[in-house]
UniProtKB/Swiss-Prot annotation:
SUPFAM superfamilies: ARM repeat (SSF48371)
Pfam families, alphabetized: SDA1_C, SDA1_dom, SDA1_HEAT
Record-listed Phosphothreonine modification sites: 552
Protein name in UniProt: Protein SDA1 homolog
GO CC entries: nucleolus
Subcellular location: Nucleus, Nucleolus
Top-level taxonomic group: Eukaryota
Any one biological process term the GO annotation gives: ribosomal large subunit biogenesis
Residues bearing PTM Phosphoserine: 232, 234, 236, 585, 589, 595
Biased composition (Acidic residues): 490-509
Protein family membership: Belongs to the SDA1 family.
Keywords annotated in UniProt: Coiled coil, Nucleus, Phosphoprotein, Protein transport, Ribosome biogenesis, Transport
């Protein structure tokens, strides 16, 4: 009977659904029967929308599954569900509300609903106190917008949704506003909505009175999540074979040099494709897309001065302001005195505050404003009453500030800090040396003569520009090296012809001809010519090359290497003996933001205290096996033997026994035999 009942189509919706999908015209009557049943159930439900209805939920999902089969009959079905959700979403049963949303998502996936109206409805449903529903809607919104912009940017839909989200961010419901912000941030990170409008909508969230929204917006601009995801090798969205697929294919196939070469080639191609697919990212690109960074930074500073949030939130605000000022080179003079109040060694997170002060420094800030900041750091940190670590942090901070704003450093302060080169603490000494080395490249004339080092071409050319001065050159510095290299190549060609003719003559005699043309000798010849050439002639040659030809990437690389060579020649000590070093061309360029390591850098590792050393030692023993052999009983529930009882017996009960009294009176021979037996027994046990 049960099998027969299962074949009854009106009561078995999954079977009917399967048959309709196979042949829709053949089952129109059965569909209309269910559709009328659905309409009657819907009318009853509208009278009491707060009551659950399992039958209605099944019918709604059935209609959604076959929506594409009868579009003329179900043309009003999506709108009915949307109206029901928009008017009654607060009173609906959670399970039924989830079913209606899933039905709409199913219809949207079949492209039977307009995306704009549906997404607006889903944003309104984010106000519901249903965590599972909010998570489902969030996933669908992100995926749907990604699919809309998959082939090309659909600006028409994007503009409508962005405007709607802008209103949602100002919504009184904190949950809905936070979810809307999360959607925008996720879409920006996936490079779907990576335009300036999205970024400037997110900037409004930085002034929200709701802490969660404020922190989410600040975290986005500070780029913490980008840094975490930057090094991930695989993404769920990437199509095509992965490195694992290629390795499995090689492991299961025939081994051989030919297949190995194929694998290596495939891995190279895969790596190249991944690089192409990877979006071009520069440091914290969202900050670069802000329309009016000056006004934004001023508003943030005003908010920071009256902020009553936790200390961590204040630190995030300070960090964002300092990044804005440093990257956009803004004028925010009130920020420096505000930061100056916190520059005390006992201040919580003082190294981060020093980092913010360094980030906010740039060459357009008047030097007198940064000078007061430098003096505060020097007076509070770089004094003998402080520990070596505090002094090191202070000198490192001064070095980073002056690297960005060299005019702020006075000659008197620099000479005082240079005296710490001979300090007893190694960290302080090395930090002072790095500061001296910085000014050897920036302006050696500010240092005392003994600290300037050997004068070289790079140090002679070094000069700090005056405040507001522009150093506009009509040539590419260092381009004269290309002219000299060209001359060397022509000479080499002539020598080559001569050596070739000589070798032809001497081949008959059977003698070898030694030809000496190494890259080191060429470098040496070019460097010698450069040294002998006056400065005016160099500039003229560089200007002639810059205006007469189009430079290639190789030419720029040669110029860069030559400029780096000048700085390498200025290095003291052992590097001076080896003049013609091979310079690493892959040197990493310095980013536009500082890291905390630049401030906290200690050249000598501090000693660990007893607790730290003990914790490290105990952590190393976790995986160590015990070397004592445990005695195992055949029956673990059996009682202890007489021998074990004897060992555990109280001595006061044993002191008058014959064994104890005779043990002390044993002869040397008895002791010798007892020792032998014990050793033999121990050896057996070790086996």
């Amino acid at each position: 009977m049960s099998g027969r009942n299962n074949n009854k189509l009106p009561s078995n919706l999954p079977q009917l659904q399967n048959l309709i999908k196979r042949d829709p015209p053949a089952y129109v009557e059965e569909f209309l029967q269910q559709y009328n049943h659905y309409k009657s159930n819907m009318e009853i439900f509208k009278l009491q929308p707060n009551k659950p209805s399992k039958e209605l939920a099944e019918l709604v999902m059935f209609m959604a599954q076959i929506g594409q089969c009868y579009p003329e009959h179900l043309s009003n079905f999506p709108q009915e569900l949307k109206d029901l959700l928009s008017y009654n979403h607060t009173v609906l049963d959670p399970d039924l509300r989830m079913t209606f949303c899933k039905a709409l998502i199913l219809l949207r996936n079949k492209n039977l609903i307009n995306p704009s109206s549906l997404l607006e409805l889903f944003f309104e449903l984010l106000r519901c106190h249903d965590k599972l529903l909010r998570k489902t809607l969030y996933t669908h919104i992100v995926t749907d917008i990604k699919n809309i912009n998959a082939k090309h940017k659909n600006n028409k839909v994007n503009v409508v949704l962005q405007n709607f989200m802008y209103t949602m961010l100002r919504d009184s419901n904190a949950t809905a506003a936070k979810m809307s912000l999360d959607v925008m941030i996720e879409l920006y990170r996936r490079n779907i909505w990576n335009d300036a409008k999205t970024v400037n909508v997110i900037t409004t969230a930085c002034f929200s009175k709701i802490t969660k929204i404020l922190v989410a917006a600040l975290t986005f601009f500070l780029g913490k999540d980008e840094e975490e995801k930057q090094d991930s090798d695989s993404e769920s969205e990437d199509d095509g074979p992965t490195a694992r697929d290629l390795l499995v294919q090689y492991a299961t196939g025939k081994k051989g040099s030919k297949n190995k070469k194929k694998l290596e080639k495939a891995m190279k191609v895969l790596k190249k494709q991944k690089k192409k697919k990877k979006p071009e990212v520069f440091n914290f690109s969202a900050i670069h897309l802000i329309h009016d960074p000056q006004d934004f930074a001023e508003k943030l500073l005003k908010q920071l001065e009256s902020c009553k949030e936790r200390f961590e939130v204040k630190m995030m605000l300070m960090n964002l302001i300092s990044r804005l000022v440093g990257i956009h080179e803004l004028f925010l003079f009130n920020f420096y005195p505000f930061v100056q109040r916190f520059l005390q060694p006992h201040q919580r997170e003082v190294t981060k505050i020093l980092l913010f002060a360094a980030q906010a420094s740039h060459h357009l800030v008047p030097p007198e404003i940064i000078q007061s900041l430098l003096v505060t750091v020097a007076n509070n940190f770089v004094t003998d009453k402080n520990s070596g670590e505090v002094m090191t942090v202070g000198i490192n901070a001064i070095k980073e500030i002056t690297a960005r704003c060299p005019l702020a450093m006075t000659e008197e302060l620099l000479q005082d800090l240079a005296q710490y080169k001979t300090h007893k603490d190694k960290n302080v000494m090395m930090s002072a040396r790095t500061l001296i080395h910085l000014f050897r490249t920036l302006n050696p004339q500010m240092l005392q003569k003994k600290f300037r080092g050997k004068p070289t071409e790079a140090s002679i050319e070094a000069r700090i520009q005056e405040y507001g001065e522009l150093d506009a050159k009509d040539y590419i510095p260092g381009a004269e090296v290309l002219e000299l290299e060209k001359g060397e190549n022509t000479e080499d060609d002539e020598d080559g012809w001569e050596s070739a003719s000589l070798s032809e003559e001497e081949e008959e005699d059977g003698e070898w001809v030694d030809v000496h043309h190494s890259s080191d000798e060429e470098q040496q010849a070019i460097a010698t010519k450069l040294d002998s050439m006056p400065m005016e002639e160099r500039k003229a040659k560089a200007a002639a090359i810059s205006t007469s030809r189009v430079l290639t990437q190789d030419d720029f690389q040669k110029i860069r290497m030559a400029q780096m060579k000048k700085e390498m020649d200025a290095a003291p000590g052992k590097a001076q003996k080896r003049k013609y070093l091979e310079i690493d061309s892959d040197e990493e360029s310095r980013g536009e933001l500082l890291s905390l390591r630049d401030i906290e850098r200690l050249h000598k590792k501090p000693k660990s205290d007893k607790e730290t050393r003990l914790a490290t030692a105990m952590a190393g023993r976790t995986d160590r096996k015990e070397f004592v052999r445990k005695k195992t009983k055949i029956n673990p529930f059996s009682s202890s033997t007489n021998k074990e009882k004897k060992k555990q017996k109280n001595f006061m009960m044993m002191r008058y026994s014959q064994n104890v009294r005779s043990k002390s009176a044993r002869s040397f021979r008895d002791k010798q035999l007892a020792l032998r037996d014990a050793l033999l027994k121990k050896r057996k046990r070790m086996k």
